[in-house]
């Protein structure tokens, strides 16, 4: 998101826009993993397209978005246990 555009089209406090984006994406099964990165266990690309279509209908979003991308994760590896086995606490 372009912050100056968010301030212009969404208003202040503009950071509430991120909460609204999250709520919309949750309707389609997305969950936030880090910052503005969202994942979904549903591999149906039509679901992704519907989410993007819904976001595009939000005027302040369409006017403020800097970059939006989608990709399919073919094989997801979780290395948390590998790292945590050396933890001291």
Swiss-Prot record:
Keyword vocabulary terms for this entry: Hydrolase, Nuclease, Plasmid, Virulence
Keyword Hydrolase (UniProt): yes
Q: Which cysteines are joined by disulfide bonds?
A: none
Tagged with keyword Hydrolase: yes
EC number(s) for this protein?
3.1.-.-
User: A Gene Ontology molecular-function term?
Assistant: nuclease activity
* Domain of life per record: Bacteria
What role is this protein assigned? Cleaves ssRNA, mostly between U:A.
Q: Which family does it belong to?
A: Belongs to the VapD ribonuclease family.
Subunit annotation:
Homodimer.
Query: What is this protein identified as?
Result: Endoribonuclease VapD 1
């Amino acid at each position: 998101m372009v912050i100056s555009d968010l301030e212009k089209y969404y208003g202040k406090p503009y950071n509430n826009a991120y909460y609204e984006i999250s709520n919309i994406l949750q309707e389609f099964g997305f969950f936030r993993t880090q910052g503005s990165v969202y994942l979904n266990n549903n591999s149906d690309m039509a679901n992704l397209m519907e989410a993007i279509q819904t976001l595009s209908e939000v005027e302040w979003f369409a006017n403020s978005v800097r970059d939006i991308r989608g990709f399919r994760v073919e094989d997801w590896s979780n290395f948390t246990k590998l790292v945590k086995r050396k933890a001291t606490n």
